[in-house]
Every structure is written in structure tokens, then in C-alpha cells.
């Protein structure tokens, strides 16, 4: 085993000392970073909704689930790069760390280029399959085609940020997103309002901001003196490391794609209520997204901390990481979910002034935000399992619990009780079902993993 890398001022020691304060130090910048990244889309929606109209708002919002379904397989693979990098870094395996970084970044570039072509040639047909109304489909297709031109930069940023998270650095990605997010907001106001470019202006602003955040993360990787330094001459795919990345990342990506497919089905059900409900769901879903990225940052922390401690052979610390993450996740979800429900109409007014749209959005928030702590718990368990290198079974159980429940609900319950309330109660029902399945899986996987690890001193 090679000497462990000396940590720079941006990195967090995940394997020693108290856990909760380090979790917060890791998760808070990641949470703010994720919120800023979500604001890229939120600014598009707010500016387009306020200055272009409800149809344009519905057009932009109707693309969210579809975009996520297309890109999340590749983003899931970045989780594999994160887990593998964290494990090698904690174990002091510098050569393996370098090979992982260069393989991951090469794959990111290739997948981004592939997604450009997917976006250009598949978006219209996909929107038609979703029964997107005729009055919004042209604008939705235009937005998606422009947005997908940013995919190479989007992928490189996300894979680069995953590598930085693996070594405990969440502060610099936050700084980069503050810069690119501010530019995105200014460009939205400039292109949509001053130049009256509508949804195209919002999409172009997002593309430019993605380019900027990508360049900044690449600069960070190119200039570091650590073992994760990126060098153009070393770019290439090493099958051994890509396979290990895929073993964790592909199941996570497939899970995300399939879950987003269930969200596409849900979007199709919302579409059946008309453009007012679509606009209300767009605004509510954007607020809902802020809850997701907040608790998901804790899941990311759980995965990185678990992976590093697994690499360092500290199984008791792995247990403590999951417990502390659950406590933190419930606190965050209850606080933010309650606030989103309490101030729902005021928050929705940021997106639109249409009273009917606000009423629909408020109703949707009521059914999704108050139980969101269940979603946080549901995601933490497979996050810990992935940190231990187990991803396939959690994927299968998540698909059965989440997607299976939602499909049953959409096609079995919703048709006989057609209302927004019944439709959106599919969320907490699917979260509960998945928690039960994942908890059983965790018990057996933890027992197996711990039996293969050496005895250690008490924490």
C-alpha cells in the first residue's frame, strides 16, 4: 500500500475524528452547490414564466422528467467514479486513483457527446409519447434541443465534481457554481426579457453557465499536485477501472433512469389535466427539487464517507456514518418540507402570477413535502450499500419498491379516483415500500461485508 496523500486545505478527513461535524462540513457546501445547480433550471422557469407566459412555463417544465431520464444513467456512473476514487484515496493507492480519474473523465466526455445527438434527434418523438399538448410541444422541443448541446460540459463538470467529493472537497465546486449561477441569472434576464428570446433564451443561458462551471472544475483538476491530477496525455479508458466504476455506477444510473421513467408516467398523468395543472406541477416540482437536492447531498456524503472508511477498514465508523446521516437527513427534510408547505403560495408566486396555477401547485406541495423525510431515509440505505461496493441489489429493490408502486398507483388506483391528491400520494406510498425492502437488504449485506473486514479498535 502506498503512502496516503497529504490532504490540502479543501479536503476533509473522513476516516478520523468526530463524524457529525465533518458530515455537515462536507454536506453543506454540496447542498448549496446542488441548490445552485437547480437554480440554473429555476431561473429559466421563473424568468420564462413571469415574462413569457403560462404556456412557455409549461413547455420548460414538461421537459424536466424527460431530460433527467435521458442523462441520469451517465450521472449514475459518476457515482461509481466517486465511490472507487474515495476507496483508492483512503487506501493510499495513488496509481489506481490516477487511472480511475482519467478513465472517468474520458467516459464523461464520450457520454456527453452521445447525449448531444440523443437530444437533437429524439426529443420531439419523446415529447409526443408523453402526450405533451400541442400548444406547448414546439417550445418544449426547442428548449430541449438547445439544452442538450451543453451535455459534454455538463458531464465533465459532474464527473470532475464527483472526483473532488471523493477526496472530501465540496467547497471549490460550490464556488464555481456561485460564479456560473450568477452568470446564468444575468443572461436569463438579458436574453429572455431584453431580447424576447423566450424559452430559447433560457436554454442558451443555461448552456453558457454549464460551460463556465465545467471549465472551472477542469482547471481545478489540471492544476492540483495530488494523485487525482488530470493530464491530457493520460486520458483514455482502462477497461479494468471502467468495469469497477460500472459495477457501482451503472446500477445506480439504471435505477435513476427507471425511477425518472415513473416520473415521466406521472408527468403524462398531469398532462391529462391540461396546461394549468402542468404549469402548477412545473412550479411545485421545482420547489420540490430543492428538497431533493438538500437531502441528496447527505446521501452523497454517506456514500463518500462509507466508501473511504470501507477502504480504510473501519467498519464501526461505517455504522456510525449511516446513523448520523439519517439523523441529519430527517432534520433537514422536516424543516425544509414544513417550510415549503407553510409558505407554498408565496413561493409559487415567484414562478407565476396565475391564481389557478398557484392553487394547483399548492395542492401538489401539500401531498409531497410533509412526508419527504421518508424519501431521505429511502435514499440513504442504498447510498451506504454503494459505499460498500454493493449496487445491483439496491437497484433492483428500488425499482420494485419505487417504480412498481408508482406504476400500480398510476394505472390501478388513479383511473378510478382521478384527482391530483390521489395521483401525488403515489410518492409517500412508494417511499415506504422501498424503505422496507432496502432495510432488509442492508441487514444482510452489512453482515456479509463486516465478516470480510479485519477486527479493529473501538471508535
What are these model-predicted stretches?
Residues 57-117, 154-173, 280-338, 342-344, ...:
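Small-residue-rich hydrophobic transmembrane alpha-helices
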Residues 30, 34, 46, 83, ...:
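Transmembrane alpha-helix boundary and packing residues in multipass membrane permease domains
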Residues 1-27, 85-150, 194-250, 306-371, ...:
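Short alpha-helical transmembrane segments in multi-pass integral membrane proteins
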Residues 16, 20-39, 43, 66-73, ...:
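Residue-level signal for short hydrophobic patches within transmembrane helices
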Residues 25-44, 146, 180, 209-213, ...:
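Transmembrane helical elements of multi-pass membrane transporters/channels
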Residues 31, 35, 39, 43, ...:
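Generic alpha-helical transmembrane segments of integral inner-membrane proteins
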Residues 78, 147-165, 173-181, 202-215, ...:
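Short runs within selected transmembrane alpha-helices of multi-pass transporters and secretion channels
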Residues 35, 39-58, 127-134, 190-197, ...:
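Helix-terminus/linker motif at the lipid-water interface of multi-pass membrane proteins
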